[in-house]
Swiss-Prot record:
This is Structural maintenance of chromosomes protein 6. It comes from Xenopus laevis (African clawed frog). It is found in: Nucleus; Chromosome; Chromosome, Telomere. The gene is smc6. The keyword Acetylation does not apply. GO terms for biological process: cellular senescence; double-strand break repair via homologous recombination; telomere maintenance via recombination.
Length: 1128
């Protein structure tokens, strides 16, 4: 067998024919999987053409491949002539009508074989085809090999020498630099081969070896591109049928052979598929038969073998028990190792909690110191404030006394000034008045004065009554306004509670179908988003929540207490890690764009509840929050233990009993706080009342809650209506009283208006008196004394005014100081309040941190105890293992590795014992049954293997053929494009224009050519051309095919038979040019023309044939209808 240039083996053509008949492996899988289709079935040629076909998917790629191929030829032509496959010489004896021709020694590049008709040119070409294994029908000179033997002779002999040099030589160590193919033809139609080395030694006489050589050299004698006879040219090239031209192209490029190969493969696949179907039915029958034979075979199994098997099973049983014990110990050891690895984690948690406790205690001390400092400041400011307040009160008293004294002196001054004026008037009147006033005038004045005083008294009484009425109505209006403000506040509270109850009622109605609506309108959407994210794998562990939805009450009366205890934790969610927390935060930001979001707690998920027995509180009559609840998930329980310490909080229904237990007596151990049935929070030294009066989240009877809320809504509606009526009534009373008050104020003003003229009249009447009997001098003395008193009083007024101003200044200063200290005390109180809240929060934080630390300390203790317990269990199991090993060694000293369980072995031992007992009773023809069973099993396995193999082969073949056919189409396109390029280029050398049209669908090829300039006339079909022009176009077509097909030599018979001198000259130049560019190929051109005009060059060799013998006009060829040759 030959090898390719890369060293891989090449299957001879005879082997390829065999492979067609074998369905199992008709193609080399590696070649099909890695390369495209090739021109022929020959592996050597496929390898060469594959280089040109790879990656040829676009027109630009084809152009690149053409230019690349041209550059390769130029490179090859410059490097020298071909080393392998070219024909060095041909020798003929008794062939056709020639006794002896040759030997003809051909040059490595261009060879012209010239001679007259009948000189033997075509005989040489025919001998080349036949001598290299071609069929007689290919030559078109006969249908049988025996027709080539010269008439009158018994045999004919053909000897062809091929070059075998260079690195691509075929078995150079065996054949040397040349291979001589010697073939002997006999008249009985047989032929024999001799393959000789360069030394003349016969190496082989097998045709397979010749086929391997041809494959290696890529020689295709049946390819019209390699060897084109006159008859082939007439049939295909000169034919006017476009289908014939297309067939010629397909045959020349070996695409036809590939297409036939593909069709044959698909037919083979179809037949194989039918065989598989038939084999499947046959396989089922064989399987059933095999099962039946196997059952009979098992039923008569040798007792000795069964007993041996029984002993073997007993040995395995002994060591299986050992293996199972070892397997039981292994997880304990691994668990101990794992648990010991987790010890560090608990210690780290304890250290972390200790650090948090220290930090929290430092915060507590800092807040306590801050509060103490504020308290000391407040205590220090309090006496100062009291002193300043007393000082203000004293100064205000002094100022008020000085103001009273000042007003008294001022009134005294006004009285004295009025008296002085009256004395002055009196003296003047006395001086001017006469002593003749009558008694009747005096009495009349006195009577008028009395009447005026009576009227004044009535007006004074009326003024007093009016003042009393004004005071009463002012107080009534103030009371009404206070009542109205109180009603407004209660009305707003009722309205707020009314809206809250309506919202709760709506949530309760919705919770009848979706309980989660109790936790807010957004909660169902949030949980749906969490479920969706969990399905998409965005959480490591799905968050749990809301926590309130995961808890249930054992006693419904404790609902308000539990809700007051857990508060915001009822809405919280728990995450296993911070990555899940961030994802949940993102989801919440979408579902809760505004307002408060539920709290997220990060706590590692574990599948069991903490053991809190050591730190939990206990009371015989009252449960803790933990024991009062039924919780769905251990993660929720652990979260509430960590965040709220529910194991340390009691629920005591009664208020008084709660105070008694928590404050008047020592509370139970580990109890920090308690909650009453009404939701009040009770500490050892504090008591906080609950704002809520009813549970909203944990209530179980929704209908009762709805009924209760509807009743309260009706009550609130009634209360709202009552308050609105009262408000309207009060507003009306206020309006009426304010109207009456305005009337009394107007009446008071009118009284003052009425009094003023009366006072003036009485003053006037009192000044008109009788002339007194006293002396005017006395009145003047009184006036002088009165003036002195006025001066003294004025001095007292000034002193009182000055003193009052000084006291006012002192009072203002004292009030400013007092206001400042009040502001300081108020600011200290304001600062102290948030500090107290922070102190309470930090206190809770300290307690939580200590509780966490205690929790992890207890967990560490439990963890270490668990490890110790596991170690003790392992030690006990290891002792048991030692006992089992010693027992197993007594049964079977050497250990057996057993993969089965002891239980399955025990079952089989019992079954085998029963079978042995039954077989000891029954006997049969054991040998025949065993033989039948083995035969049936072999048949079944053989058919099963073949069916499986064929199924795999069909599947692989489908995949390969799909890829190969795609590559075949791409390769055909590449060859078509390259052929068009070369054809157009060759025509242009004669100034012709033309094109080749390929129709692969209809399998036609049309050539249109226009002699002369292409733009002067339309393209014409070759039928319109002259004989010389048509021959020239045909040569261009041939040369185009030469450019795309691979073969070491080309043979062309009478290519210029119909050409004129000009076209012959141009065609010759084109062939020589191509030969010069392809020096690695050999060209053998047969022509009857005289080649004396050829240029003298070392590349061209002319072989002239002798003229035929006189009288010889025809060659003794046999008719085509004679019997076909025997290929073997």
């Amino acid at each position: 067998m030959g090898k390719r240039k890369d060293g891989s083996p090449i299957a001879p053509s005879s082997q390829r024919k065999k492979q067609r008949q074998e369905v199992d492996d008709p193609y080399d899988e590696e070649d099909y999987g890695q390369a495209g289709p090739s021109v022929s079935n020959d592996y050597g040629q496929r390898k060469k053409q594959r280089k040109e076909a790879d990656n040829s998917h676009t027109d630009s790629d084809y152009e690149n491949s053409v230019s690349c191929a041209s550059s390769q030829r130029v490179s090859a032509s410059q490097s020298g002539t071909g080393d392998v496959g070219i024909i060095e010489s041909i020798f003929l004896r008794n062939f056709m009508c020639h006794s002896m021709l040759g030997p003809f020694r051909f040059g490595p590049n261009v060879n012209f074989v010239i001679g007259n008709n009948g000189s033997g040119k075509s005989a040489v070409l025919t001998a080349l085809i036949v001598g290299l294994g071609g069929k007689a029908a290919i030559t078109n000179r006969g249908s049988s090999i025996k027709g080539f033997v010269k008439e009158g002779q018994t045999f004919a002999e053909i000897s062809i020498t091929l070059r075998n040099r260079g690195q691509d030589a075929y078995k150079p160590d065996v054949f040397g630099n040349s291979i001589t193919v010697q073939q002997r033809l006999t008249t009985d139609g047989s032929r024999t081969y001799k393959l000789k080395s360069a030394t003349g030694a016969v190496v082989s006489n097998k045709k397979e070896e010749l086929t391997a050589i041809l494959d290696h050299f890529n020689i295709q004698v049946d390819n019209p591109v390699s060897v084109l006879t006159q008859e082939m040219s007439k049939h295909f090239l000169q034919s006017k049928n476009e289908s014939d031209k297309y067939k010629f192209f397909m045959k020349a490029t070996q695409l036809e052979q590939m297409k036939e190969d593909y069709s044959y493969i698909m037919e083979t696949k179809s037949r194989t598929h039918d065989q598989v179907e038939n084999g499947g039915e046959r396989l089922r029958d064989l399987r059933q038969e095999c099962i039946q034979k196997e059952e009979r075979f098992k039923s008569i199994a040798s007792l000795g073998e069964m007993k041996e098997k029984l002993e073997d099973l007993k040995n395995k049983m002994a060591w299986a028990l050992v293996t199972e014990s070892e397997k039981q110990i292994k997880p304990f050891i691994e668990q101990i190792s794992t648990e010991e690895g987790r010890t560090v984690k608990y210690e780290q948690k304890i250290e972390e909690c200790q650090g948090k406790v220290i930090n929290a205690e430092e915060k507590f001390r800092a807040k306590q110191e801050e509060l103490d400092k504020i308290t000391q400041e407040a205590v220090a400011l309090k006496p100062q404030g009291i002193g300043l307040k007393e000082d203000v009160q004293k100064k205000r008293k002094s100022y008020n006394e000085s103001e009273v004294l000042y007003n008294r002196h001022r009134m005294e001054l006004k009285r004295l000034e009025r008296d002085a004026e009256q004395l002055h008037k009196r003296i003047e009147e006395l001086k001017k008045s006469a002593d003749n006033d009558s008694e009747s005038e005096k009495m009349a004045r006195q009577k008028e004065i009395n009447q005026i005083r009576e009227r004044m008294k009535a007006l004074h009484d009326k003024d007093i009554t009016t003042n009393q009425q004004i005071h009463q109505f002012q107080q009534a209006i103030e009371k009404y306004k206070e009542e109205r403000a109180r009603i407004g506040n209660e009305e707003r509270n009722i309205k707020q509670r009314l809206e809250q109850h309506k919202r709760q009622l709506k949530e309760l109605h919705e919770s009848k179908t979706d309980r989660l609506k109790r936790f807010g309108q957004n909660m169902p959407a949030l949980l749906a988003a969490i479920d969706e994210a969990d399905k998409l794998g965005r959480f490591r562990k799905k968050p749990v929540g809301p926590l309130g939805a995961c808890i249930h009450l054992k006693d419904q009366e404790l609902a308000l207490a539990v809700e007051s205890c857990l508060k915001g934790l009822m809405f919280a969610f728990c995450c296993d890690n911070h990555q899940d927390e961030r994802m949940l935060q993102n989801i919440m930001s979408r579902e809760y764009p505004r307002g408060r979001r539920p709290q997220i707690i990060v706590n590692e998920f574990i599948d069991h509840v903490y053991d809190v027995r050591q730190r939990a509180t206990f009371h015989p009559d009252h449960p803790t929050v933990l024991t009062a609840l039924e919780i769905d998930h251990p993660v929720v329980t652990n979260c509430l233990i960590d965040m709220r310490g529910i194991e340390t909080i009691l629920i005591i229904k009664g208020k008084d009993e709660a105070r008694e237990i928590m404050q008047k007596r020592a509370p139970p151990r580990n109890c920090r706080e308690a909650f009453t049935g009404e939701g009040d929070q009770v500490y050892t030294n504090r008591y906080y009342s609950s704002d809520s009066r009813r549970a909203t989240l944990l209530s179980r009877d929704v209908e009762a809650e709805i009924s209760h809320l509807e009743k309260e809504l009706r009550n609130f509606g009634s209360q709202m209506a009552t308050f609105q009526q009262r408000a309207q009534s009060v507003d009306k009373d206020i309006k009426e009283n304010e109207g009456i008050l305005r009337q009394y104020h107007n009446s008071k003003k009118q009284i003052q208006i009425d009094l003023r003229p009366l006072l003036e009249r009485i003053s006037e009447l009192e000044n008109v008196e009788e002339q007194p009997s006293i002396d005017i001098a006395t009145l003047e003395g009184e006036a002088e004394e009165n003036l002195n008193k006025i001066e003294l009083v004025k001095q007292e007024v000034e002193l009182a005014k000055e003193k009052m101003g000084n006291l006012k200044s002192f009072l203002t200063t004292a009030e400013i100081n007092y206001e400042e200290i009040k502001k300081k005390i108020s600011s200290v109180a304001e600062v102290a309040e948030p500090v107290k809240e922070d102190l309470h929060r930090v206190d809770q934080e300290v307690e939580n941190c200590k509780r966490h630390r205690k929790h992890y300390e207890e967990k560490l203790k439990e963890h270490l105890d668990r490890i110790q317990k596991r170690k003790e269990e392992v030690a006990a199991k290891e002792q048991e293992l030692e006992v089992k090993i010693s027992q197993a060694k007594c049964i079977c000293p050497e250990r057996i590795e057993v993969s089965r369980t002891a239980r399955s072995l025990d079952t089989e031992i019992n079954r085998l014992r029963e079978k042995i007992n039954s077989e000891e009773v029954l006997h049969g023809n054991r040998e025949e049954i065993i033989k039948q069973y083995h035969e049936a099993k072999e048949r079944y396995q053989d058919v099963e293997g073949k069916v499986k193999h064929l199924k795999r082969f069909i599947k692989l073949l489908d995949e390969i053929m799909a890829q190969r056919y795609k590559s075949y189409q791409q390769f055909r396109r590449c060859l078509t494009f390259r052929c068009k390029i070369y054809f157009d280029s060759l025509l242009s050398q004669r100034a012709y224009s033309g094109k080749i049209n390929f129709d692969h669908k209809n399998e036609t090829l049309s050539i249109t050519v226009q002699p002369g300039e292409g733009n002067k006339a339309a393209l014409s079909d070759m039928k319109c051309l002259s004989g010389g022009e048509r021959s020239f176009s045909t040569v261009c077509f041939i040369l185009s095919l030469w450019s795309i097909a691979e073969s070491p030599f080309r043979c062309l018979d009478e290519f210029d038979v119909y050409m004129d001198m000009v076209n012959r000259r141009i065609s010759m130049d084109m062939m020589l040019s191509m030969a010069d560019s392809q020096r690695f190929r050999q060209f053998i051109l047969l022509t009857p023309q005289n080649m004396s005009s050829l240029p003298s060059t070392s590349l061209v060799r002319i072989l002239r044939m002798k003229d035929p013998e006189r009288g010889q006009t025809t060659l003794p060829f046999q008719p085509l209808n004679q019997e076909a040759e025997d290929e073997e």
